[in-house]
Regions:
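A bilobed periplasmic-binding-protein/Venus flytrap-type ligand-binding module shared by bacterial periplasmic
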Residues: 112-122, 212-229, 284
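Secondary-structure end/capping motifs
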Residues: 225-308
Length: 332
């Protein structure tokens, strides 16, 4: 009886220890966003809340960003192993030695847009010559502006860039301290509300520049040494985006719960516009998150021609689709 009791106690102790211990070691990932959290980031917060990253062995920390250019630089430097950035920025900076690799595309369409006041007399990109464009210093739009300028027949240096905080864009535009600003389409509704009928707008994709937008990028060295971790991250992220397309409300709720200053209705509108940016024939027919070879080759040539590359490279080294589940596709 005594032996049986001891064995029972030992078994109970072992079971308790196993229950208290993690199933496997968690890989800490500091994932830098392209910007401050918003509706476009809802899937990451939802997957984290649901424990999907944790179940995949990832201890995820979501770090607010300060622009795509900054995100690329930090990932390339290894300060963050994984991040989110505009793909055209990643291609441009790769030519300067920034070793990052795209592994999951979010914006199949360029999210970039230009905003101005109609009352200013501006009607198109060409009218921006000699004008002031305000946005944050690290904003990705500045990096790829030369391509848009050349595509519209104006000198890229004919505009003056004014450093302003992202939250000051509308106020600066209304005060006419700047003539135009840049912003992503997923907050288009905010500009419409604030500027009303005086809002002037052109989407870059409709002005000759539809490069791939926000894409999950990975530090090249980290990818080589941690393929299983990257594969797990992409698998969860792809699953999360598909889940949010199917049912956005709980995803946006998870975002708002983690970022108390955000308002649910506003971020839900944000997400609805994100869905538009995610949708193209490749995300619908090949896989959600895919980077098409021909489009990537075209984006590379555009960057090379209009912006310039310090060091040319094989564009296929800048991205991979190997971690995607091709059974998961964009449904809208």
């Amino acid at each position: 009886m005594q032996l049986a009791r001891r064995l029972a106690l030992l078994a109970g102790s072992v079971a308790a220890a196993l229950a208290a211990a993690p199933a496997f070691a968690q890989q800490k990932i500091d994932f830098i966003l392209n910007w401050v959290p918003g509706g476009d980031h809802a899937p990451y917060y939802y997957a984290k809340k649901m424990g999907w990253y944790k179940d995949a062995g990832i201890d995820l920390n979501l770090e607010p960003g300060k622009g795509s250019a900054v995100a690329v630089q930090k990932v390339a430097a290894g300060a963050n192993p994984i991040g989110l950035a505009d793909m055209a920025n990643a291609l441009t900076l790769r030519g300067k030695g920034a070793d990052t690799v795209g592994v999951f595309n979010v914006y199949a369409n360029s999210p970039q847009g230009l905003y101005w006041l109609k009352s200013s007399g501006i009607k198109s990109v060409k009218d921006l010559a000699g004008k002031k464009i305000g946005n944050p210093a690290g904003d990705g739009a500045r990096t790829i502006w030369p391509a848009l300028a050349k595509a519209n027949g104006i000198d890229a240096n004919s505009v003056t860039w004014v450093n302003i905080d992202a939250n000051s864009k509308l106020a600066a535009l209304k005060a006419k301290s700047i003539d135009a600003t840049t912003s992503f389409y997923n907050i288009h509704h905010i500009f419409q509300k604030e500027l009303g009928d005086d809002m002037g707008f052109v989407a870059w994709k409709d002005a000759g520049l539809n490069t791939y937008g926000n894409t999950v990028i990975v530090n090249g060295d980290f990818l080589k040494k941690n393929k299983a971790v990257v594969a797990a991250f992409v698998k969860v992220t792809q699953k999360a985006f598909a889940a949010c397309v199917a049912n956005p409300n709980p995803c946006v709720q998870a975002l708002v719960e983690a970022n108390g200053a955000l308002q649910f209705d506003n971020e839900l509108q944000n997400w609805r516009l994100v869905e538009v940016l995610m949708s193209d024939k490749f995300s619908k027919t090949v896989a959600l998150g895919v980077l098409d070879d021909n489009r990537m080759a075209a984006d590379y040539e555009l960057v090379k021609t209009y912006i310039g590359l310090d060091t040319p490279y094989d564009v296929k080294t800048a991205y991979t689709n190997e971690f995607l589940d091709h059974s998961i596709k964009m449904t809208k």
